[in-house]
Amino acid sequence: MPGGLEKTCHQCISKIASNACFVVVLCAFLALPLSMTFIGMKFLEDCPIQPLIPLYLLVGGIVGTLKVSLLLYDSTRMRRLLSKAVVIDDDDDDEYPWRQNAHRYYIHLLLSLFLFLWFILGNYWVFSVYLPDFLPPFQQPQDYCDKTLYLFAVGVLALSHTVLVLLLLCSGCVYLCSRWRLAADED
């Protein structure tokens, strides 16, 4: 990545992450993994047809809470640094914090990778038993899944799909705009 583009991306991410609205959105977003954890724990034994659905919610909720908490910590730390008017010199090694704090960067990367793979597994587990019986059938009492648990899992996946599509669209727009801007600068 050219140095100018890297610096521009860093400045853009820094402005977004240090914005108070971003912190509020992260706090609101923390409700989803916490509710996933709660629903997963509450209904852990209530889906014998696919016992991995409550486990998907439980583990995804715990790891998601950890990920959002780390993002909140990083964002508030950046806000604190900016409020102290810390000016980073262009020649300073601290210009790109992810280079200096590589361990934190790799933790975020690993958590994101795990959550993405867990999301794929969750899709398989939830939709492999699409619309199960919500009450235990008399003949086969093991072929059911609690309605609240199942519909919550489907809702979480639908929300995740929506956010993923929006992120891909926004990333594509940013990429196209940056390419267009670079082409305009070269002319």
UniProtKB/Swiss-Prot annotation:
Compartment list: Membrane
Alphabetized InterPro entries for the sequence: TMEM272
Keywords assigned: Membrane, Transmembrane, Transmembrane helix
Transmembrane spans: 21-41, 52-72, 107-127, 149-169
GO cellular component labels: membrane
Bilayer topology term: Multi-pass membrane protein
Stretches assigned to coiled coil: none
Annotated signal peptide: none
Protein name in the entry: Transmembrane protein 272
Annotated organism of origin: Homo sapiens
